[in-house]
Amino acid sequence: MMSSCGPLLLAVSCCLVALTSSLNLDDPNVCSHWESYSVTVQETYAHPFDQIYYTSCTDILNWFKCTQHRVSYRTAYRRGEKTMHRRKSQCCPGFYESGDICVPHCAEKCVHGRCVAPNTCQCEPGWGGADCSSACDRDHWGPHCSSRCQCKNEALCNPITGACICAPGYHGWRCEDLCDHSTYGNNCQQKCLCQNNATCHHITGECVCSPGYTGAFCEDLCPPGKHGQQCEERCPCQNGGVCHHVTGECSCPAGWGMVCGQPCPTGRFGKNCSQECQCHNGGICSPSTGQCVCSSGYTGERCQDQCQVGTYGIGCSQACRCVNGAQCYHVSGACLCEQGYTGESCEERICPDGQYGLKCDRKCPCNTNNTRSCHPMSGECSCQSGWSGLYCNETCAPGFYGEACQEVCRCQNGADCHSVSGECICAPGYKGSDCAIACPPGTYGINCTSLCSCKNGAICSPIDGSCSCQAGWHGVDCSINCPSGTWGLGCNLSCVCGNGGACNALDGKCTCTPGWRGDRCDQHCQDGTYGLDCRERCDCSHADGCHPSTGHCRCLAGWTGIHCDSVCAEGRWGPNCSLSCNCKNSASCSPDEGACECAPGFRGTTCQHICSPGVFGHRCSQACPHCVHSNGPCHHVTGQCECLPGFKGALCNEVCPSGKFGKNCGGSCTCTNNGTCSPMDGSCQCYPGWIGSDCSQPCPPGQWGPNCIHTCNCHNGAFCSAYDGECKCTAGWTGLYCTQRCPLGFYGKDCVQACQCENGADCNHISGQCTCRTGFMGRHCETKCPAGSYGYGCRQVCDCLNNSTCDHMTGTCYCNPGWKGTRCDQAGGNIAESPNSLTSAALPMDSYQIGAITGIIILVLLVLILLLLFIIYRKKQKGKESSMPSVTYTPTMRANTDYAIAESLPQTEVLPNSNYFSNPSYHTLTQCSSPPHINNIPYGKMNNNQLFVNLKNTEPRKRLSLLDHTGTLPADWKQGGSFSELGAYGVDRRYMGKSLRDLVKSLPYHASSCSLNSSENPYATIKDPPLLLTKSTECGYVEMKSPAHRDSPYAEIHSSSPANKNVYEVEPTISSVQALTNNNCNGPFCQDPYDLPKNSHIPCHYDLLPTRDSSPSPTEDSK
């Protein structure tokens, strides 16, 4: 076949060379090169296949029969591509075809010249440049461009005279000088507008501001919170400190140090912490005011004074509880009792009640019912409140109360005083602790508990609540107006108003109806006036006065309108004012012709249009000015520029000043706490630690930073700084995020206080309180349990007898000599024991415990032996399963009418220990029927592309019902990448997250009911598998290998490889779906009269060989 194609290929090559050689080969600008092209040929090759035979062996499980393999070869055909070469002529680089010659090409057109070589122009006389387009370049001038220009700073040079044309910002003969500091621009003629010592750019006039200033002309100070060059530096001032706009130096409130971030150190206060505190006795000084916060027991401006008698504690705010003349300690409030008293507050008498004297042998002479106590030493009676006298048998005199009736009553306004408590019992109309306050307006009676019902300003009696009405009112609660025609107090006076005038119930003054006047409303309005009190003047032009009540003009004949000033009514014109005007936008209408006279800013026959953009005013005759920052042209009526928010000025070219924003800069910025205000909308850009529309709200708890976007990471109740997120720990915690307890031995705020616990006691890291170990007590656990007690908190009582001692921790009894036992309650005989020894009998180990432990050990050994036997059994069973056959379907490529060629799959998909079967003679045996449940497999794809299924136009529900099918391959089946996880035509091999291999493993397949007879080629027919869904009249082919499970030999489908593939010579077919979708077939599987001879149909069944155990031959592996 190869020899027959040689002359034909040579002839084709010669023709192609002749067609491509149209250029003149003698042209020196013609170049040639070789190009390659492909020709399809058909060639033969030796195709290996695996043949199976049986031998006798010692395999008991297979009845002493073993399967062996050998590799055989047969001749097969395949199509291939042969690469040919031919010479091709073309123009050399830089030339292009023009007829049969190659001419040079210039990328840029030669304006005044011609192209003589690639990208090379030959200019005409008098021109220069790469494209002959300019007389001289910018650096040369004069005849033949022979003189070099002397201009500097990008200045232009006159090509004729050589004079320099300076760029903006420069001047001088050669443009070597910059504009001075006050000018800029072309010829340095524009005046700089910079302020506050700013530098003006010599070209653009842009202002470079001095430190501390900003704005277009450096006219504004840096905004709050900024300072320095271009206001780019952020002020470090905290806690209300004010930053200098130039240096950034902080002016701090009193009590703050460097950058206002740290409070004054201990002992200092005031501005810049310059003053020294003067507090004594452990008082703490306020860092801002220097005011002393005194320690417990002291008071005064500098904490120099002890608490007054009767008070103690911090701020001397607590009252002493000491009684019976005891002295109170000003720091802790502890009581120092007088002789004869005891107790925490000295409230307990040493003598029993009713007794006194050094030996408590004398009886108190006091009245027991009225006496609080009897002095335990002197027997003096201390009377209860409300009683007095030597023996407490006299009541208090009027005006006195309390202990010994020494307190003076403070009751006023005739109130009674309670003899015991001194409480005032007020008379009706008064209240307060001393009855000095009269009942407030609206209340009356005892303790002012009753509410007055008086209305309309009536006065309520604080004693009985009776109402005194104001003028114009009457009734019990003064809620009724005076009857019509009456007025004054008690409604006793009569009104004198006429013509419907109203009478004021308070003063009787008349209020006249419109059109009347006078004290009694008995006079008409004068001519030319009308309305209430005749205060309004008639506004009539052509009228005979107006109505005295309404002011309506009485128009003369021939006039109309509200003021009688129009010939016709408003909006009408023509004969008898019978036509309506059609003018819009407040335009006036001519009464005789109806023509519209437009208002300023409008135009059109009916004034329906506003002025065109760019003009305004009367008849739209004025031109608008140039509005810089505006929504559009000027206002069509006024000609004013409508500035965008944030700008102002006649031309909208000025930014709103600091503190202003919005339309016409009419809004006032509300930003606080160093927030920056936008001149456009007034929105605030808040300083870190603040949020809100006006930056007035601090960050919510747990947030910090700009816009509070950061989340605090402080723990255990720590305070988080809203500015930088720094954690300030509560008592008992430390660390960057307050997650660490105080170190062992320390507690409290900042963990600076040392624990005082002893004897191994635990110290609370927050309060420092000691938790004692067993056997100890006391504030610092410094004391052992007292004799007779033991245990936690020393709350347990020892139970030892015979004067024995008890261990303060465990309560164990230490027996004295001669005693023994747990409680030392047994006589010890003659055995002398140490008084501190403690004996106990050892408990013998029971024999049943030893037996139980032995039985458990034996049981564990038996379980391990059974588990080992089970593992050995499973491994043996798996070894048997590896030799069972399975069936796999593989597509082939047609070569000719006698042979089929199996295409290769990627080597990575080869499975080890696979056994394959071939069908060299194709003996058809009895057809086998697959189990009925195989038809219900919900898949249309086989694993690893052993069988490709075309599902392109098949609905999912219909796929399950189709049984007969032929496999197809995509056109690019040779590309290994398409066989990874996709089936034919890109159909995914996975279904609901499972691969087909996993799904097939889980299906309950069973072995075929067919029997396989032992012969040289014992083939059996296998029915076409139900996974093929598209109907066809012809079939593919299959190849078989061993499965993974012995009990379902046809259940699992594995990948194949070129090394061990065995192909059945069955014709490839094209599915009905592929035929519809691929009319222009160019792939290796297209059918044509040459590929498919007559009578090439093969039935839809496949042959099966028995299994074998031999491995593939080395020849197959190398293949």
UniProtKB/Swiss-Prot annotation:
GO cellular component: plasma membrane
Record SMART domains: EGF, EGF_Lam
Domain EGF-like: start-end pairs: 98-133, 141-176, 184-219, 227-261, 274-304, 312-347, 401-436, 444-479, 487-522, 573-608, 616-653, 666-696, 709-739, 747-782, 795-825
Glycosylation sites: N197, N272, N369, N393, N447, N492, N576, N674, N803
Residues exposed to the Extracellular side: 23-851
The keyword Coiled coil is assigned to this record: no
Secretion signal span: 1-22
Stored Gene3D superfamilies: Laminin, Tie2 ligand-binding domain superfamily
Subcellular compartments: Cell membrane
GO biological process: apoptotic cell clearance; cell adhesion; muscle organ development; myofibril assembly; positive regulation of muscle tissue development
Membrane topology type: Single-pass type I membrane protein
Location of the EMI domain: 27-104
Cytoplasmic-facing ranges: 873-1119
Cystine pairings recorded for this chain: C31-C92, C57-C66, C91-C102, C102-C115, C106-C121, C123-C132, C145-C157, C151-C164, C166-C175, C188-C200, C194-C207, C209-C218, C231-C243, C237-C250, C252-C260, C277-C285, C279-C292, C294-C303, C316-C328, C322-C335, C337-C346, C405-C417, C411-C424, C426-C435, C448-C460, C454-C467, C469-C478, C491-C503, C497-C510, C512-C521, C577-C589, C583-C596, C598-C607, C620-C634, C624-C641, C643-C652, C669-C677, C671-C684, C686-C695, C712-C720, C714-C727, C729-C738, C751-C763, C757-C770, C772-C781, C798-C806, C800-C813, C815-C824
Gene disruption: observed consequences: Morpholino knockdown causes widespread disruption of myofibril organization and decreased muscle striation resulting in curled or bent tails, impaired swimming, and reduced motility in response to touch. Severely bent tails result from subtle abnormalities in somite boundaries and abundant gaps between myofibers.
Sorted UniProt keywords: Cell adhesion, Cell membrane, Disulfide bond, EGF-like domain, Glycoprotein, Laminin EGF-like domain, Membrane, Myogenesis, Phagocytosis, Repeat, Signal, Transmembrane, Transmembrane helix
Primary location recorded for the protein, binned into one broad class: membrane
Keyword Transmembrane helix: yes
Record field: transmembrane: 852-872
PROSITE patterns named among the record's database cross-references: EGF_1 (PS00022), EGF_2 (PS01186), EGF_3 (PS50026), EMI (PS51041)
Function: Membrane receptor involved in phagocytosis by macrophages and astrocytes of apoptotic cells. Essential factor in the regulation of muscle development including myogenesis. Likely plays a key role in muscle cell proliferation, adhesion and motility. May control the balance between skeletal muscle satellite cells proliferation and differentiation through regulation of the notch signaling pathway.
Family to which this protein belongs: Belongs to the MEGF family.
Name of the protein in its database record: Multiple epidermal growth factor-like domains protein 10
Classification of source organism: Eukaryota, Metazoa, Chordata, Craniata, Vertebrata
